[in-house]
Amino acid sequence: MLDHLSPGQPVDLVGHSMGGNVAMMYAGVRPERIRRLVNLEGFGLPATRPAQAPTRLAQWLDEIKALRRGELDLKTYDSADGVAGRLMKTNPRLGADKAAWLAQHWAAPDAQGRWAVPGDAAHKVVNPQLYRVDEALAIYARISAPVLSVIASDDSLGQWWKGKFTLAEHRERMQHVPQLTEARIEDAGHMLQHDQP
C-alpha cells in the first residue's frame, strides 16, 4: 500500500492497538519508509516460552476448524441501536449520542437486514506463532523515525492480561526505540480516540 500511495517517500504512520503493533514492526523492518510514527496503545503481546508451542499450535488448529464451521462468525445486530449498545458495553465512557453516531458510520445492514460490523472473524483465531519479545526488541531498535507512544490513563493491559503482561513491561520494551516520546491521555481507555478526540 505504501509503495502505491507514496513510492520512494517515507510516510507518517499512525496505528492503534493491533495496528500500532504492526506499525512498530514495519517501522523496524523498513525504517527507510517511515518518517514519523504514532503508536496509540499498540502494546504487543505477553512474552511466551518455547514449551507453549505444542499447546498453541493445537489451539490454532482447533480454532481454524471452528472458524470453518462458522462458530467464530462476528455477531450481527437487529439495528444500529444494537451496535451502539455493544460499543457502550465495550467502552463505558462512550455516551449514547456518540455511540449512535459511530454505529451508523461503522456498521451497515447486511443482505438479511441485520447490522454487521466490518471485520474478519479470522482475527479471533489465535496466532500459531509464539510472540518472541527478543525478536520484537531487535526490530524496535532498528526504528529510525521519531516515535510517539500514546497510552490511555486506564490500564488496558491490566484489564486484558491480568498480570501476564503489564504496563511497566510495555514501557521497558519501548525503551529500545531510539527516538521515543511517551504521552498519556487522561480520562481515556483503550479507545482513546473516542474518549478524548
Predicted regions, residues:
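Conserved loop-alpha-helix segment in the C-terminal half of the alpha/beta-hydrolase fold
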Residues: R142-A188
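Glycosyltransferase donor-binding loop in the core domain
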Residues: K75, G189-L192
